[in-house]
Regions:
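Reverse-transcribing Pol proteins
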Residues: 1-142, 235-237
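Short amphipathic helix-turn segment from helical bundle oligomerization domains
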Residues: 66, 202, 242-245
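Catalytic-core region of right-hand nucleic acid polymerases
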Residues: 72, 80-215, 261-264
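Short amphipathic alpha-helices and their capping/turn residues within compact interaction modules
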Residues: 90-93, 116, 223-226, 230, ...
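Short, flexible/disordered secondary-structure transition segments
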Residues: 96, 228-232, 251, 268-273
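Histidine/cysteine- and/or acidic
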Residues: 153, 255-273
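Short, conserved secondary-structure transition motifs
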Residues: 159, 163-165, 177, 243-246, ...
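Active-site palm subdomain of RNA-directed nucleic acid polymerases
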Residues: 211-259
């Protein structure tokens, strides 16, 4: 059962402002330097502020307390949930465990587990329940439009290099989780598990505004690679397709340059041809 109110949560010792630390490996100074010549200064300012202070998820409406039941899949795969929570807490991206709710407006959504293509399972937070009163219901999708790169975009780039163009791919790992959320919105991303309470502090999958918000950072990386480092690429969210001339080391050099830039900015990557 999902989205059932379990009663008004009772706060215990509250989370202090001093505990509201932003968690992201992304290096503000590197982005500031690399984006210094970007023409859209307001956008750059927003991006840098997001790295320093976290991004707003765009929720409109009151932050009211609510507790939702976890999905059946969570009880069917408890080790998955426990392991994922422990990993995220250790990484500093999830706060907890708390014996009592950490904020008066704490709102928990249902935890669940879903299978991945590699046969493993992954933890999810069901932010679209309860219907009509969920976190996602409070985020207007028209405020967060996203336009993905298409196959035609990739074909156009490849065609510029002609027959025999060399392709490679660089993936940003745990990409959404690199983007921190502003502390004012942490109470919207609550979880409860085995009698304890947790709060997410980084972009989760399933949040309505997450693809748009993450893509702003991916677009920044794309601009940096193309403008400052002469890397020819097209990206679809966290996947970057890099193209080089046939019979030359351009593609390999571009991959290495991409990995160097990502390392300086502190993106986690996996690259392969």
């Amino acid at each position: 059962m999902v989205g059932t109110t379990l009663g008004n949560p009772v706060p215990g010792p509250l989370l202090h402002l001093g505990d509201r630390r932003i968690c992201t490996p992304l290096r503000h100074s590197e982005f500031e330097t690399e984006l210094s010549l970007h023409p859209d200064k307001a956008w750059v300012s927003w991006l840098l502020n997001g790295i320093a202070n976290g991004v707003s998820v765009g929720f409109v409406g009151p932050h009211t307390p609510h507790l939702s039941r976890n999905l059946i899949s969570a009880s069917q795969h408890p080790l998955i949930i426990s392991s994922e929570l422990e990993k995220e807490v250790a990484a500093g991206r999830v706060l907890g465990p708390f014996e009592h709710i950490p904020t008066p407006s704490f709102r928990s959504s249902g935890l669940g587990a879903i299978p991945k293509k590699n046969g493993r399972w992954s933890m999810i937070l069901h932010l679209s329940a309860p219907y009509g009163r969920s976190v996602n219901d409070g985020i207007h999708k028209e405020q967060f439009p996203i336009h993905y790169a298409t196959v035609d975009d990739a074909v156009d780039l490849i065609s510029r290099f002609g027959k025999g163009a060399i392709l490679a791919k660089v993936d940003l790992k745990a990409a959404f989780r690199m983007v921190p959320i502003h502390p004012d919105d942490w109470d919207l991303l609550g979880m409860q598990w085995q009698g304890n309470f947790y709060m997410d502090t980084c972009l989760p999958f399933g949040l309505r505004s997450a693809p748009f918000l993450f893509n702003q950072f991916a677009e920044a990386l794309h601009w940096i690679l193309h403008t400052n480092h002469h890397v020819d690429a097209v990206h679809y969210l966290d996947d970057f397709l890099i193209v080089g001339s046939p019979g030359a080391d351009q593609c390999a050099s571009s991959v290495q340059e991409t990995l160097r830039v990502c390392e300086r900015e502190a993106w986690y990557t996996s690259g392969h041809g």
